[in-house]
Amino acid sequence: MMKIKYLYQLLLSHISILILAFVIIISLFSHFVKEFAYQNKVEELTSYAVQIANEFQSGQVDMRRLYPYQDILSTRKTQFIIFNEEQQPYFLPEGFHHPPREQLKKSEWNKLKKGQTVTIRADGRFDDEVSLVAQPIFVQNEFKGAVLLISPISGVEQMVNQVNLYMFYAVISTLVITILVSWLLSKFHVKRIQKLREATDKVASGDYDIHLENSYGDEIGVLASDFNIMAKKLKQSRDEIERLEKRRRQFIADVSHELKTPLTTINGLVEGLNSHTIPEDKKDKCFSLISEETKRMLRLVKENLDYEKIRSQQITLNKLDVPLIEVFEIVKEHLQQQAEEKQNKLMIQVEDHVIVHADYDRFIQILVNITKNSIQFTQNGDIWLRGMEGYKETIIEIEDTGIGIPKEDIEHIWERFYKADISRTNTAYGEYGLGLSIVRQLVEMHQGTVEIKSEEGKGTKFIIRLPLTAKQQ
């Protein structure tokens, strides 16, 4: 299949339309000019014929009065003949040698007798093609003859040809200018499309940083804007894929590390038991360590499975109206020992009437995970569990006086196994950030929001907002 460049396609389409338009316009204009010239010639002859015929209204006419008409008409190369009622000419112009009876046909003479004017725009009955007008002469309503005016149309044809020639020159000039302008415009548009093609090639090769400058509001400009948006989205997708891949690798490394530590401990203890190198009085402690490390691995696996179920929305929430102070008391009782081990104080601040609309077990899980995170990074400090009523919502705050979180790490704290501080790598269960990942997913499933306010060295505050039911509102 023959390939034609887009530039030439544009030019060909423009030129084809122009040529077609010019052909139609020239044809119509030429026809109009010709018709107008003939019509004008016939009207002029008719006007003179009527004036000459009016000279006979009195019944008698001095032939000398016709000579001025002859002089005027001769300058226009027009001749006239006057016939009597028997179709015999009794006034002939000088040098007119045609047989008189051949000047008018019988049908034309009959029309004249009826008082009708005979007009013929182009007739070839004479040596030259002429326009012909015959006007009847009536005296007191009695037919007395006719006036015949004859004018060659060569002048009309010459004028029409001259107009057509000028039209041809104008069309050629316009066509040349149009082709030049069309070439420049086509080059301009093709250049813009070429930039789009080059940008597309770069995107195809993996360069998503490309940006097309665009200051036009036409379709190509809109396409360039859409291309920039597409490239931006592709770049974001690539960055997100790379980030997720990095997180996946880090996740695998973290899980492997966290599983390796208890497995190494368990393996060492089992080998010690098998080889009887562990004293009898230490075996109970050995079994206790094996049990703790096994539970630690089970918790890790359970947390991951739980997170995936929540993320894929495979769990169903059973929301109830629960007194907030009741939940706070359960969380405090559950984590009191862990807090005391780090010399922390757990304190509750909530009025008895404050209600939260949530899934009981999952809401406790949310508070336990956040509170455990606060205990983990607070030493000899205070941890507050606060609750209050907001506008159509319940507000829960968990605030500590711990080490805080760097500003640049706050948005990443919800990621699995993310460690915002190097101190998180060697702490007990809870350092993985897995609990906070679950928190965010669960809060969103409750149609709520959770945010973090933190300042390094001063502490961290988690703010949870859960909507109330219609009845409570």
UniProtKB/Swiss-Prot annotation:
Protein name: Sensor histidine kinase YclK
Segments on the Cytoplasmic face: 1-9, 186-473
Entry-annotated residues carrying Phosphohistidine: 257
Membrane topology: Multi-pass membrane protein
Extracellular compartment spans: 31-164
Location in or out of the cell: Cell membrane
Taxonomic superkingdom: Bacteria
Any matching Pfam family: HATPase_c
EC assignment: 2.7.13.3
This protein's UniProt keywords: ATP-binding, Cell membrane, Kinase, Membrane, Nucleotide-binding, Phosphoprotein, Transferase, Transmembrane, Transmembrane helix, Two-component regulatory system
InterPro entries per the UniProt record, alphabetical: Bact_Sensor_His_Kinase (IPR050398), HAMP_dom (IPR003660), HATPase_C_sf (IPR036890), His_kinase_dom (IPR005467), HisK_dim/P_dom (IPR003661), HisK_dim/P_sf (IPR036097), Sig_transdc_His_kin-like_C (IPR004358)
Keyword check for Nucleotide-binding: yes
Enzymatic reactions: ATP + protein L-histidine = ADP + protein N-phospho-L-histidine
UniProt GO MF annotations: ATP binding; phosphorelay response regulator activity; phosphorelay sensor kinase activity; protein kinase activator activity
Organism: Bacillus subtilis (strain 168)
Transmembrane segments: 10-30, 165-185
SMART domains: HAMP, HATPase_c, HisKA
Cellular component GO terms held in the UniProt record: plasma membrane
Function: Could be member of the two-component regulatory system YclK/YclJ. Potentially phosphorylates YclJ.
BP GO annotations: osmosensory signaling via phosphorelay pathway
Domain Histidine kinase, chain residue ranges per copy: 254-470
Broad enzyme group: transferase
Domain HAMP: 187-239
